[in-house]
Design a protein with these regions (language model features):
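Bacterial Sec-exported substrate-binding components of ABC uptake systems
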Residues: 2-100, 211-237
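Extracytoplasmic substrate-binding proteins
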Residues: 135, 148, 152-247
């Protein structure tokens, strides 16, 4: 991949910004990288903007994904290990749970046709409403998807959590059906706003970068306003009840207690 390294930034009025300093960009045969998305907290992904409207998502310790614009094809000489995702995305299988709220925040639940959870398991009310209305349907949990339904519904992308790494045969089967698999690694971010900033990645997938940047800026502002919040020095026990009915207490280093 050819690249520019002058280092200037460009930003729209709503906060979406790119830089043409791509000196650290991966070298991918078949594409020319021109700029990359500016990130403030996230450390586990980068989004690169290429010639002719292509975008490259590079997930740390994960995979690389090429977003191919509507009406175009992947370059013939593209590196074989780059996963190709064709836009527009309209019939996603959402097997991961955390991205649902991010899709909802940029008004994009209509791109999700298939769900890895039943309506009563969703914490996002708009997702519950979509399932009750039939515009989003249950397609099996991440570990046991309904492959026939994925095919009959013309699924164009499966979004999975890292739990799919424990079910490699499931991922392989989905890919054998010519459905690209994107693995969300937002849980590996070291701080809450890093995980929230993954909304910018999904904004790039859906060509909604401005909407995603607006939402993130608002959330960052809320957190910034808490910087002077007085520490009471009080502690709290954080636990949940698992499917066996047992109380599970998380370590203080785990994401929820830290957040």
């Amino acid at each position: 991949a050819e690249s520019s390294t002058s280092g200037s930034d460009t930003a729209s009025a709503d906060g979406f910004a790119t830089t043409d300093d791509v000196s650290d960009a991966p070298d991918i045969t078949g594409i020319t990288i021109e700029s990359q998305m500016v990130l403030n907290y996230a450390e586990c992904f980068n989004v690169y903007y290429c010639t002719d409207g292509y975008k490259l998502i590079d997930v740390k310790d994960g995979a690389q994904y090429l977003l191919v614009p509507d009406g175009k094809e992947a370059p013939d000489d593209l590196d074989s290990d780059v996963i190709v995702i064709h836009q527009p995305l309209e019939r996603i299988y959402m097997a991961a749970t955390s991205p649902m709220a991010l899709f909802d925040a940029i008004d994009s639940l209509d791109t999700i046709r298939l769900s890895g959870e039943t309506a009563d398991n969703w914490y996002v009310q708009d997702a519950v409403d979509a399932m009750n209305a039939g515009t989003m349907i249950f397609a099996g949990k991440y570990s046991e998807p309904d492959y026939e339904l994925l095919v009959s519904e013309n699924c164009d992308l499966a979004i999975e959590s890292t739990m799919i790494l424990h079910s490699p045969k499931v991922q392989e089967m989905i890919e054998m059906l010519d459905i690209p698999v994107f693995i969300d690694r937002s849980s590996y971010e070291s701080q809450p706003l890093g995980r929230t900033e993954w909304i910018k990645l999904y904004g790039a997938m859906l060509d909604k970068e401005e909407e995603a940047a607006d939402f993130f800026a608002n959330q960052a502002s809320i957190v910034e306003n808490l910087k002077d919040f007085q520490n009471t020095e009080k502690t709290v026990a954080f636990f949940y009840i698992n499917t066996s009915g047992a109380a599970v207490c998380l370590l203080y280093t785990s994401p929820s207690p830290r957040d």
